[in-house]
Structures are given as C-alpha cells and as structure tokens.
C-alpha cells in the first residue's frame, strides 16, 4: 500500500473543534524547541540593542518602541516557516482534506495556538522595555497593547505568504519578501500609537484601527489560506 493510500485510509471520519484544538495544542507543546527559537531571538535583540546604541536615556526612550516592535516582527516571521510545511509532509493535511474537515477552522486553530506561543508571550516580554529602554510602565503597557492588537494581522499576513510558497523548494526564503511589504504599515501605525500616548495625545483610534484590521484578517485570511493549502496538496 502506498504512503498516500495509507494516509487516506487513516483519515478520521469526523473532526470537530475540540479534537482539532487538543491535537494542535499537543503538537505545539511537543515542538517546544521550534517555538522557543523566535522568543530567544526577540530577547537577544532587545537585550543587545541598548548595548549597541549606548546608555543615554533619551536615545533609548526614543528608539525603544521601534526596537521592540522590530524584534517582535522578526521573531514572528522566523516562526512562520513551520506552520504548514510539517502538516503537508507528514500527511496531516491530506487526512483533513480526505475527511472533509473544515480547513479554515483548522487553519484558524493552528494560527491562534501559534499566536499564543509566539506573539502572546512576546507581548508579555515587551514589558522588559521598562528596564532596558527606560520606558515608563504606562508606555510599556501601551506598547504591549499595540502588540496584542497588531500582531494577529501580522501573523495572518505571514501565514498567507507561507501558504503561497509551500510547494516551492526554497519557499521559506520568499516568505519575508512577500510578507514584510504588507506588514510595514502595521509596524508604522503601532509605533505611532505608542508615540502619541507618550506625548500626551490620544492614540486610541490607531489601536482601534489595528484591532479592526486584526479582526478582519482573522475572519478572512483562514479561508484564503485554506484554499492555497488545498492547492498545494493537490499539486
């Protein structure tokens, strides 16, 4: 029996939300090394940045928000490569397609869990900007809020780029090239919101805009990703 035939034969009859969630949560916990690498990269960047630019408080405060956000973006892009490639290689995607499971639901669950283990933790670690960049706790709180509201949209854009390059031999190299131009506006708006609050102005409209964009991307992008994943499996 061929590998593809055995994969089809092993396909489950029905897959609901909770079985998918439990399975993806267990897979994420078992691959701790993979999701720890981006977090280590984030910590390395925000730790070494103050050493590189000097200890002048005003300079650190001016560059701190941008440095944390760039580190968050790089760590997010770094962890996207393993989102769908293993599922395609080990037959999980084939099982889901053959079982007529909801691919958009699976994609959404996978991305939500990935966000919890990546940007969710990064948002908490961003509070290290208080001692490292001489930010106030208020500014650090706004920075964390901007990461929470903006990072889901960044993740969805990276996931779309990853799914588009899934069938390519060196597709991981193309993911940042495709995703970063779309992610730069999010980065600009997020850092701008923190700067507005720091100067005493109201940055809530920008945070609301980031949140609206993230909600819209969460509602739409899983369907787009599901279509591209199915095309990659058929090819």
PLM-predicted stretches and their roles:
Residues 108-133, 153, 157, 191:
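Hydrophobic alpha-helical transmembrane segments that constitute the membrane-spanning cores
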Residues 141, 146-180, 230-235:
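A structural motif at transmembrane helix-loop-helix junctions in multipass membrane proteins
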Residues 31-54, 69-73, 178-189, 214-221:
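Hydrophobic alpha-helical transmembrane segments of multi-pass membrane transport/permease proteins
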Residues 2-7, 218-235:
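Junction motif at the cytosolic side of a transmembrane helix
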Residues 28, 77-97:
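Transmembrane helix boundary and interhelical loop/hinge segments in multi-pass membrane proteins
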Residues 2-38:
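Aromatic- and glycine-rich beta-strand/loop motifs that create alpha-glucan
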């Amino acid at each position: 029996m061929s590998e593809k035939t055995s994969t089809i034969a092993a396909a489950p009859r029905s897959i609901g939300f909770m079985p998918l969630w439990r399975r993806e949560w267990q897979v994420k916990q078992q691959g701790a090394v993979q999701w720890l690498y981006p977090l280590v990269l984030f910590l390395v960047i925000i730790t070494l940045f103050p050493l590189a630019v000097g200890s002048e408080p005003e300079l650190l405060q001016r560059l701190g928000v941008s440095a944390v956000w760039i580190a968050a973006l790089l760590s997010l892009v770094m962890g996207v490569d393993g989102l769908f490639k293993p599922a395609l290689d080990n037959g999980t995607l084939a099982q889901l397609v053959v079982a007529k499971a909801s691919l958009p639901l699976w994609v959404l669950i996978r991305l939500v869990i990935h966000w919890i283990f990546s940007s969710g933790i990064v948002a908490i670690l961003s509070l290290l900007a208080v001692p490292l960049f001489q930010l106030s706790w208020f500014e650090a709180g706004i920075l964390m809020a901007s990461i929470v509201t903006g990072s889901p949209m960044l993740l969805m854009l990276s996931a779309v780029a990853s799914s588009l390059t899934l069938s390519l031999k060196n597709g991981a190299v193309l993911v940042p090239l495709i995703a970063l131009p779309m992610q730069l506006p999010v980065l600009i708006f997020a850092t701008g919101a923190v700067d507005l609050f720091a100067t005493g102005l109201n940055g809530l409209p920008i945070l609301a805009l980031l949140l609206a964009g993230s909600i819209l991307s969460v509602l739409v992008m899983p369907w787009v990703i599901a279509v591209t994943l199915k095309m990659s499996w058929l090819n």
